[in-house]
Amino acid sequence: MNAPLPMTATQGNRPTLAELEARDAFAARHIGPDTPEQQHMLKVLGYDSRAALIDAVIPEAIRRRDGMPMGEFTEPLPEEAALAKLRKLAGKNKVLKSFIGQGYYNTLTPAVVLRNIFENPAWYTAYTPYQPEISQGRLEAMLNFQQMVTDLTGLDIANASMLDEGTAAAEAMTLLQRVNKHASNTFYVADDVLPQTLEVVRTRAKPLGIEVKVGPAADAAAAHAFGVLLQYPGVNGDVTDYRAIADAVHAAGGLVVAAADLLALTLITAPGEWGADVAVGNSQRFGVPLGFGGPHAGYMAVKDAFKRSMPGRLVGVTVDAQGNKAYRLALQTREQHIRREKATSNICTAQVLLAVMASMYAVYHGPQGLKRIAQRVHRLTATLAAGLQTLGFTRTNATFFDTLTFETGFNTDAIHAAATARGINLRHAGATRIGVSLDETATRDDVVALWEIFSHGKPLPASLTFDAIEAAAEDAFPANLARTSAYLTHPVFNTHHAEHEMLRYLRMLADKDLALDRTMIPLGSCTMKLNATSEMIPVTWPEFSQIHPFAPLDQTVGYREMIDQLEAMLCAATGYAAVSLQPNAGSQGEYAGLLIIHAYHASRGESHRDICLIPSSAHGTNPASAQMAGMKVVVVACDENGNVDLEDLAKKAELHSKNLAAIMITYPSTHGVFEQGVQQICEIVHQHGGQVYVDGANMNAMVGTAAPGHFGGDVSHLNLHKTFCIPHGGGGPGVGPVAVGAHLADFLPNQDSVGYRRDDNGIGGVSAAPFGSASILPISWMYIAMMGSAGLTAATENAILTANYVAKRLSPHYPVLYTGQHGLVAHECILDLRPLQKETGISNEDVAKRLMDYGFHAPTMSFPVPGTLMIEPTESEALHELDRFIDAMIAIRKEIGRVEDGSFDRDDNPLKHAPHTAAVVTANEWTRKYTREEAAYPVASLRTQKYWPPVGRADNVYGDRNLFCSCVPMSEYAQD
């Protein structure tokens, strides 16, 4: 892999046609180091080949040597051939205009948003903004999203996105249970809630022992539930005045969640104004394509009293070291990476890229533009309703915004067939009912076409003309629900309506951030590798982006073939027997895997097995997921080398033998080494009746070289947004497939509510759509198809090679905390800065912030060990970039040395004051005990290419003590 181009005939060697075809050319572009660079790194490490290095790193007992056959995808496809093959699959899909609704709508993505966000690597290759100083652009965009949701829902505070509406509702249920001291264990769901949402809620409730009751909204108070879920508007279109119901629920000791349509909220009373305590929903119709179900940004907004119990990311406003406004992630102590099994949720990746798109849709249109879109949709719906009633059809919903449900008698199938023939999908609302949901793409012609479809081919009455019916159509939601409160009044939603202004605003935000389009992002455990352009191109093809998740099967043949092929690819890579792509984040894959284990035990009459063993080094999502799955966490100790303490494991497995459900391990370990005893771990747990969950977060170190399904794993989740090249999007989207052994295949998730049943024994839906974030699956398909088995294996080998090269070169300067056999690491390494901090006061945070002055994103801070930095360079970085990072780290170590020898003041030095903004460096007054040049240009190369952090070090304590999670008043900008 990465061989030099073949010599030409004039050079004396005539290349073969196979060499000229260069079928593996993509692998040479994906893998950063070329052959000479690889040989150089191997020489530094003392090995003569990649194979020799890998043999030294990976235990022989688990080493994979079968070449990882993948059927027709074993050999790589050139980029153009892979695109052509995928285009052929896409062509098997049928793109109809879907008026199905049920939470998903056609939408018009503004071209300026599509090109400059969705298709822009400055946005889609960024990471979650844990380092706020180099993330100010997307943090501002996320804050816009929060402001948009807060305004439209009429509540006090919103988070920065949820995975989808179904999981948002499930999270709201558990939130209300946490904050409500009501003795009840019942959660009441109105019978007009979206069916896919109800299924996800039921799935979440079952392991937690929550009883879900379903019935009319009017009966909610009588249920004496701790919480009530109301759909607003309902699935059949009704716009209900819930004021009295909310009052009655509150009087009975309950709390209220509204699942609300954001576009409808521009015209109807906000949930917070009629008594809802929490609002959830989907922002998809704000410019995000259907995508066969995702990815889309769900949302959650709550009353101020519940802000510390809210799940997911929350952007807040703080000040930097100079007292200037800055954005940051707020209240992180409630999240899984800190609170573990006590966290409010297991959410890690959410849907930031899609939330940014939705927020920019609102910025682009502004409040008046959104209202105009909503009014037009409602007017067309009212016109459609009046015409169908003229034709003799009975409408079952007295009120509506955009959705109608009509009685069709025995003509239902014929109407559906006629609609399909005209290129339109309608909602199946029962044997004798049809639902129609209009959206911003609907036209006058669509309304007339629907009249003709319902008329069974008979000519429309002469009196039934669009203009005549439209002129008489009236608003069809209760007058007392007409919205009177203002929304989106902040200048950001009222300024950027000219496209030049919008374009420059997006550019200004992007320029504030560091993403992979500027520099490597060496985040350990995060695998920030190349997201190739050819992989991204198919995502916006209409055949993938414009398909409704509940479209008829015959319209999604290409999607399902692609999904089947991708599942087979992932089975080949992992050694498992079956895969589900439904989980739309790694955390959801974990959760699904644990539910599958529970279902398996229950099928054997052992539902009492509820103990989950988790090593102390585990990622925070592991214990959080176990708690959500109804399991009790028992921590297993790790030894001084970071490995699972086999003696402690054996003791605890024996102690809990009768109730042992599973162990969750990460492999290679979160400490970045291949533990020698992994098979022994699996054997101990299996001997006591448990299942082995192998967290696939570090699968980038195993593809082609080891397989969890071969060395004892029973179930794993994968992160397609790590190992298989889906970009991180600044904090989502992600895909977290769950892969299982043959004995667990029957328990993979269904989505019965929308007709997706994989197996009668399958667990309930864990995502709202049957295939989760389906529209980004082509990214991973393209990556695997273009790499082939040998290319994927070479990628793994190079990921291990680059990590060991970085560790080797940095080890004289920083202690490498953990190594495996032969003193080597896996695909990442941990630098221990604790001794330096003890000696000099310079912390890992100081080093992380100083790296920004050198133009780098910091490695992972304090995970899995406090006071450390974890580095994962991936296979995609060329030697030049690796050396640039290494040189920066060495230069920083020399700066620390100057603190040690006293030539830098212990408190007034470039590390303690990092990062340095242009404003600070160019200020008239400079009183620091080091030079401006030392601050801004610590290495000469920065003079030709310099990134300036837009803010100084963010004050986290101030931000949490003075929590402010809405757009900053313009007066604040004027002061900056």
From Swiss-Prot:
GO terms for biological process: glycine decarboxylation via glycine cleavage system. The keyword Protease does not apply. SUPFAM superfamilies: PLP-dependent transferases. One of its GO terms (molecular function) is glycine binding. Its EC number is 1.4.4.2. Its cofactor is pyridoxal 5'-phosphate. The modification N6-(pyridoxal phosphate)lysine is found at residue 722. Keywords: Oxidoreductase, Pyridoxal phosphate. GO terms for cellular component: cytosol; glycine cleavage complex. It is an enzyme of class 1 (oxidoreductase). It catalyses: N(6)-[(R)-lipoyl]-L-lysyl-[glycine-cleavage complex H protein] + glycine + H(+) = N(6)-[(R)-S(8)-aminomethyldihydrolipoyl]-L-lysyl-[glycine-cleavage complex H protein] + CO2. The glycine cleavage system catalyzes the degradation of glycine. The P protein binds the alpha-amino group of glycine through its pyridoxal phosphate cofactor; CO(2) is released and the remaining methylamine moiety is then transferred to the lipoamide cofactor of the H protein. The glycine cleavage system is composed of four proteins: P, T, L and H. Belongs to the GcvP family. This is Glycine dehydrogenase (decarboxylating). It comes from Cupriavidus pinatubonensis (strain JMP 134 / LMG 1197).
